[in-house]
Curated annotation (Swiss-Prot):
Pfam families: Enolase_C, Enolase_N. Optimum temperature is 90 degrees Celsius. It catalyses: (2R)-2-phosphoglycerate = phosphoenolpyruvate + H2O. Keywords: Cytoplasm, Glycolysis, Lyase, Magnesium, Metal-binding, Secreted. This is Enolase. (2R)-2-phosphoglycerate binds at Q164, K338, R367, S368, K389. The gene is eno. The active site is at E206 (proton donor), K338 (proton acceptor).
Amino acid sequence: MYVEIVDVRAREVLDSRGNPTVEAEVVLEDGTMGRAIVPSGASTGKFEALEIRDKDKKRYLGKGVLKAVENVNETIAPALIGMNAFDQPLVDKTLIELDGTENKSKLGANAILAVSMAVARAAANYLGLPLYKYLGGVNAKVLPVPLMNVINGGQHADNNLDLQEFMIVPAGFDSFREALRAGAEIFHTLKKILHEAGHVTAVGDEGGFAPNLSSNEEAIKVLIEAIEKAGYKPGEEVFIALDCAASSFYDEEKGVYYVDGEEKSSEVLMGYYEELVAKYPIISIEDPFAEEDWDAFVEFTKRVGNKVQIVGDDLYVTNVKRLSKGIELKATNSILIKLNQIGTVTETLDAVEMAQKNNMTAIISHRSGESEDTFIADLAVATNAGFIKTGSLSRSERIAKYNQLLRIEEELGKVAEFRGLKSFYSIKR
């Protein structure tokens, strides 16, 4: 099938942090349109594809994206007009070649990705198909287990917690709807516990709380308390996941990590994590070491990878070259997937496919700067990834993804699968 792209345009809109981002629209020959907004991260891996910002301090404190918008309207549009909207790989290849750099720094990953996503949406809309079905075909049916970021630390908060995200994982349920309900009830229970202990319960960028607690371990204890008080069983119905974002507390010059006010070597930090895993129902740990500390990842996965999902985010940046190195070294048993780390839909799908073929799980993820766009909800089902990270149980830009997944589960009906603990196929649980 050949359906011509007749118009491509972009504009500057705002993300959930009030910072500018790129929205693209792609129009097909019959007038069908696809629209997409790109997200933006706060803690970014150094190997990520680059978003372009204007750096004009007089506009949006230098964070404007008029240059990226111009790149869509003046460079990308002429190249894509006349192309087949149903040939996503060729569209994305054209975008990559048009940019010509390894990290998409000429046109900007924000410009390229907005268009790539909008093309996929336009094609789905033309066929009258939901996006997940267009991208994933008839076998797209697995609803993801949500990893819900309810306590924030690190670069996502102005508090004294080193680890960036403390998540609840409602994996012991039979449907996404039930898992979401459990997550919401635990979130509200957690708010009450924190409030009664005198903590501020304002929420951060991803909708989680950012209390000043005595240690990272105390944050885990508070989560366990919230799970139990909400009427659920930790370690059976609801588990804990951590995103350490260890690059943010790593001193490159000294080669040490700073955790709970102490210097720790990779080996000592490994022991610290192992103690936490032994004491608490922790099922997933993301970026436990800095993005270049390959040896530590390999050793840690060797030690605990049979019972804990070890996830590479900054380590891989959704890049198949870095992922193939990780597969070869057995550095992790899971990868975090972020569309804007790599910059096109096709490359994102390639990374998921490579991971799954090598018995690694893939977690489809949001960024801290999000929007009302629900592309990643459909992507999670399209790829049967089994996992999604899309924030806490507050803030509309996070809830939008959860609500889209509720719709998809309802639409799939009896075909829908929520695999719960079985989604953790790379560990022996």
